[in-house]
Amino acid sequence: MDKIIIRGGKRLSGAVPVSGAKNSALTLLPCALLTDEPVTLRNLPRLADIDGFQHLMNQFGVSTSIAGARPEDFGRVMTLQATRLTSTVAPYDLVRKMRASILVLGPMLARAGEATVSLPGGCAIGNRPIDLHLKALEALGAQIELAAGYVRAIAPDGGLPGGRYSFPVVSVGATENALMAAVLAKGKSTLHNAAREPEIVDLCNLLVAMGAQIEGIGTSDLTIHGVDRLHGATYMVMPDRIEAGSYACAAAITGGEVMLNGARIEDMEATVQALRDAGVHVEPRKGGIYVAADGPLKPVTISTAPYPGFATDMQAQLMAMLCLAHGSSVLTETIFENRYMHVPELNRMGARIETKGRTAVVHGVEKLTGAEVMATDLRASMSLVIAGLAAEGETQVHRLYHLDRGYERLEEKLSLLGAEIERVGGD
């Protein structure tokens, strides 16, 4: 099994391209199920999860073609066409590796009148139930059945009538599934307390480009007027705000300066504020975001929250950066339980982090030291890389399949910035 070896202590400097957003791409891909015309997505990141979702779409009879497949390219262009659906079942062997597979439920139901999806796996971060997905689809008129590890959704004869649903808690995935189901419903649908993440806006913008009628984009109250059919579209995937924030933390912990080409500061204001509070200089520049750290890092107190709050997907990376802050930082995780699995690994590198329930206290230390560490999930694995970049000596990060799910060609990008990092085959 591959591992990454980092020889730390190098100051990061230079420019790095920010890839298309993984969390957006995995929502845009299933939109191809909503039309028999071609949907072309540009700036699609090269990631294991994207490849897995492509295989899932092929399972339904969706044709896919890829341009920009040269080894030196960042990003790709994929065209998907669901001329005729040959299956409405997402089987266990494809779904188990990737939670995002549940996002085919809404669009498949809207297009075909039924959908059967294996209950998802693919994530070790606490309990991520899909009950809100199912309740939202029921509110739009679907009949839901659960049996033998599968969920089956069935629309009434004539299609989904549409309806009204108020999310008891904000759910990004459930908002996405409900949106994709509602755009082809026979009537009007309203979604209250909907998620407002930039990735939701990206989804809405693609659906509108395909002919959907959606009001309230970017707010927590969405109104969808169902249409008879959607057409194809060509769309550019938004830049990955989590990847951009991760590289910003890497620049900061090494006392470096980095230009994040393609990043949009308006998508990541909470992350930018946290970095500024920690003493990092962040400013928008033409074509991206400039990040520089030329002084000591300061401790911060922060809680994760739904957008526009601080993203849970940035918690581990910020924590790694704060290991070298001058003072004690307090991080509270309000979105997912069990999202501190990186803490023991960071402590192996000399960090001083204490956890109690959903709160972690990070006592800044003078230095980190290289060690062999093991990734436990996607963002935790990036936190170990960030720590390794600043650590004295050599750090080896194992279980790279987590990183490959969410960071396009990580070692190449960090090498562009001067990091001494390589991927090698494991024992």
UniProtKB/Swiss-Prot annotation:
Keywords: Cell cycle, Cell division, Cell shape, Cell wall biogenesis/degradation, Cytoplasm, Peptidoglycan synthesis, Pyruvate, Transferase. The keyword Metal-binding does not apply. GO terms for biological process: cell division; cell wall organization; peptidoglycan biosynthetic process; regulation of cell shape; UDP-N-acetylgalactosamine biosynthetic process. Gene3D superfamilies: Enolpyruvate transferase domain (3.65.10.10). It catalyses: phosphoenolpyruvate + UDP-N-acetyl-alpha-D-glucosamine = UDP-N-acetyl-3-O-(1-carboxyvinyl)-alpha-D-glucosamine + phosphate. The modification 2-(S-cysteinyl)pyruvic acid O-phosphothioketal is found at residue 123. Cell wall formation. Adds enolpyruvyl to UDP-N-acetylglucosamine. It comes from Novosphingobium aromaticivorans (strain ATCC 700278 / DSM 12444 / CCUG 56034 / CIP 105152 / NBRC 16084 / F199). This is UDP-N-acetylglucosamine 1-carboxyvinyltransferase. GO terms for molecular function: UDP-N-acetylglucosamine 1-carboxyvinyltransferase activity. Its EC number is 2.5.1.7. Its main location: cytoplasm. NCBIfam families: murA, PRK09369.1.
